[in-house]
Amino acid sequence: MRSAQVYRWQIPMDAGVVLRDRRLKTRDGLYVCLRDGEREGWGEISPLPGFSQETWEEAQTALLTWVNDWLQGSEGLPEMPSVAFGASCALAELTGVLPEAADYRAAPLCTGDPDDLVLRLADMPGEKIAKVKVGLYEAVRDGMVVNLLLEAIPDLHLRLDANRAWTPLKAQQFAKYVNPDYRARIAFLEEPCKTRDDSRAFARETGIAIAWDESLREADFTFEAEEGVRAVVIKPTLTGSLDKVREQVAAAHALGLTAVISSSIESSLGLTQLARIAAWLTPGTLPGLDTLHLMQAQQIRPWPGSALPCLKREELERLL
């Protein structure tokens, strides 16, 4: 006997979270809880403003329609990426497809003061990998900060994310301030330039490896082995169903590329599922999930070791 519940939620964000020149004051989303007999599965649907094609309101309409169809016995999935991902996660939990084992390691994220990152890395066991957002300030400053971090921590490897912020000139200004001896320890730089061709040229000219992120969601993108391209960064909330995520990971691995499962600033419930997906599909690769500290609360399922308060399902607004 199938049954389902849908919850709507809103989490206050820390001041200073900016996405595409727009301050994110709250993170808004939905949960779906599916039941079939004794089994239960949860999924999170939280379109990311400025990045997702769909709005939160559109996702809510699509989710409620899909849940009603599922209750009638339908087996299909919705079209919208965030809804398809959340629904497929709930189904994967319900059927036991999504393993429980999780990779709760996360590459620490530096969005501001590099001194904070140095302190966090000092306590990090094993392989030291961190992520730094670049392109928010002057390219020269970004280059100096990256150089400083690589110089200060000799066993550090950095993942950088520019979100296509730079012109070729700005990208070259960044590279100019990174010691060529340190560039090999830049694991990859996500989408440095506004176009893929400019990003490819940057990789060839500087020896700094790049990764595709936004490109994966463009209609003309194909998986290819290319000089200077080392990785793909997969954000499941923006990608679609769990099957589509699996297909992209498999396509990347077949070409010898690193596939990194990455957060779209999901709640703790969504992040714990991403940690399980990472352990399952990309074992041995540190996922990019260090975004919980941007929020003021957790929900339903806490992230291990987090001191943030965790809301229970009874405290959320139920829609169905």
Curated annotation (Swiss-Prot):
Residue ranges of coiled coil: none
Enzyme class, first EC level, given as a word: lyase
Cofactor(s), names only, from the UniProt record: a divalent metal cation
Gene3D superfamilies: Enolase-like C-terminal domain, Enolase-like, N-terminal domain
Annotated metabolic or biological route of this protein: Quinol/quinone metabolism; 1,4-dihydroxy-2-naphthoate biosynthesis; 1,4-dihydroxy-2-naphthoate from chorismate: step 4/7; Quinol/quinone metabolism; menaquinone biosynthesis
Binding site for Mg(2+): D161, E190, D213
Catalytic activity: (1R,6R)-6-hydroxy-2-succinyl-cyclohexa-2,4-diene-1-carboxylate = 2-succinylbenzoate + H2O
Active site: K133 (proton donor), K235 (proton acceptor)
EC number: 4.2.1.113
A single MF term (Gene Ontology): O-succinylbenzoate synthase activity
Record-stated family: Belongs to the mandelate racemase/muconate lactonizing enzyme family. MenC type 1 subfamily.
Function of the molecule: Converts 2-succinyl-6-hydroxy-2,4-cyclohexadiene-1-carboxylate (SHCHC) to 2-succinylbenzoate (OSB).
HAMAP family named in the record: MenC_1
Name of the featured protein: o-succinylbenzoate synthase
Organism: Salmonella typhimurium (strain LT2 / SGSC1412 / ATCC 700720)
Gene that encodes it: menC
